[in-house]
Amino acid sequence: VFTPEILDEMFDIYKQHKFFIKDKNGKEIRVEDTRHMRSLKFRECLQNYFKDKDISFNFLGDGTNRMALLIDGYVYKLALDDQGYIDNLTEFKMSREAQPYVTKTYETNGLFCVAEYVTLISYDEFVKQKMRILEILDILSSEYLLGDMGWTKKNYCNWGYRKNTKDLVILDYGHMMRVDTNKFICSECGGFLSY
């Protein structure tokens, strides 16, 4: 889908840490919200690229650290900052081992990750599926530390249904990591660490 040239351009935008806009008098003003400005620059760049290539796509929306696009039936998650980049790498790493409870992530270069498209659930559906969600979280929490996917109202949009099987899965799991019991033991005294 992406040429090496557009990937280079996207990486240049990603690496940019200073953004300026012009006020009504033409004076340049530095914008502090680099994540938001990066999102706007990415959108502009991608719209032009897809128009030139005659590729249909949809912007699915922005999250805290990534934006999502739907291209040819796949979700492309684009990192808006360093945490989004790490989230893409994490999801690629965790995807295979956390099946069937998370969306499949097929590939990543850090900036983008390509993932399975699932149907987002509504808040009402989230409430109806409470027992199944808690069951999935309980299964995963036996081996993983889970972030940003628990049973709270703000996390309902991190869940969806697989298209073919209608299985309930987590679609944003960039803050998930395997439990490493060595990290709970002090390397100096051997005592238990609490966080």
Language-model segments: residues:
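ATP-binding glycine-rich phosphate-binding loop
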Residues: F2, I6-D72, D81
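Intrinsically disordered, compositionally biased low-complexity regions
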Residues: T3, M10, Q47-I55, F59, ...
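ATP-binding glycine-rich loop module of kinase domains
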Residues: D54-T103, G110
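Short, surface-exposed coil-to-beta transition loops
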Residues: T64, T108, K153-C157
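Active-site beta-strand termini and strand-to-loop segments that position acidic
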Residues: L69-G73, Y117, R162-K163
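Conserved structural core of kinase catalytic domains
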Residues: L80, R96-L137
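Protein kinase catalytic-loop region centered on the HRD/HxD motif
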Residues: S142-G150
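Catalytic activation segment of kinase domains across protein kinase-like and atypical kinase folds
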Residues: M149-Y195
